[in-house]
Amino acid sequence: MDEAVYREMADVQSAHWWYRGRRHILATVIESLKLPKEAAILEAGCGPGGNLPMLAQFGTVSAFEPHDGARDAANAKGAATVLPGTLPDGIPFPQPFALVCAFDVVEHVEDDVGAVRALGAKLAPGGRLLLTVPAHPWLWSEHDVRNHHHRRYSREAFAKVLDAAGLHTDKLTAFNAHLFPIIAGTRLIQNSLGLGARAEEAVPSPAVNSLLEKIFAAEASQVARGGYPTGVSLLAVASAGRPQ
């Protein structure tokens, strides 16, 4: 991603409703996985490290990030060991993990099947892979361009990636469903008018930010228990499947 995108992410990830709401949803899903005590956890492409303190509630966290500035910011949080690394061929940790996470990372990698296969190869026996990606190719916008996405995924396309990577899909659900009509409408209007996506990435006023966070975070129990048929994003939980 561009340097400016990393800086913006570092500036807003602790306060913006989307990051806060997503962390609550992810924490609820992880809690439902019943990981072993002091589980070894890996986050791929951790960026400036906004998820690391949340992950550290569930075990001992390692992470990797290719961008120097983002990696420095992540290490400064003190919640994980963060090393340089890339997907699919540059994971810097030799050991297996009970939980391997990649939150909105796979869409940045040209070889998405190879990336998911490499992450799956780091699973300890009984381990789980937790992934999120942006949904609906028709929602492609300037936001995706600025973030150097290669693609957005339909549910069927993401299921095929997991299968091609040799994994068993335990859960595949949409999320960010409650706000989906508003976000989809905004993206479509922006696209039709040729507008950029900078406004949606800024932190709204405190009242609006709090309201949006509550609406988004309210999905947590439903995502953990079952899921939603459609939304702005997809979440998958997978485990080791057939040998490659």
Segments (PLM) and residue ranges:
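Short aromatic-enriched loop/helix-cap "lid" or pocket-rim segments at secondary-structure transitions
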Residues: 75, 141-145, 182-186
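Residues lining the SAM
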Residues: 103-106, 132
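Short, glycine-/aromatic-enriched active-site segment of Class I SAM-dependent methyltransferases
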Residues: 10-11, 129-151, 155-161
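Conserved N-terminal segment of class I S-adenosyl-L-methionine
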Residues: 1-103, 113-116, 206, 210, ...
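Di-metal (Zn2+ and/or Mg2+/Mn2+) metal-binding site signature of metallo-dependent hydrolases
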Residues: 108-112
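A C-terminal cap/extension of S-adenosyl-L-methionine-dependent methyltransferases
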Residues: 179-244
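A short glycine-rich, Lys/Arg-flanked "PGG" loop and its adjoining helix->strand segment in the class I
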Residues: 113-128
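Conserved S-adenosyl-L-methionine
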Residues: 167-177
